[in-house]
């Protein structure tokens, strides 16, 4: 048994692999086989179940059930703009003891299509353990 599992699942439709591919290239010391001509990102990156609303909740439910049996605590990070909404989290957490912490920070609005985005994003940290 371990003391803590930290979970930071994808919040939206963008898979982590496409965001962090350069770290993987460095760590593996291997050039990707096929790369997008537009983005330079390897084409083989696939979305996970956490990148889709319909599968994210059930996948998270399964991950929590597995994790709570392996660790005393789970620390989960997720923001208020994520695919899984606050009401969904409340339902997921019904069978656990939860402490919730919130941190507000400035939203990233680098492109024009994000100009209507809220100024602040709320990062929620959930400390989870069995009841």
Predicted regions located by residue number:
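Class I S-adenosyl-L-methionine-dependent methyltransferase catalytic core
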Residues: 1-131
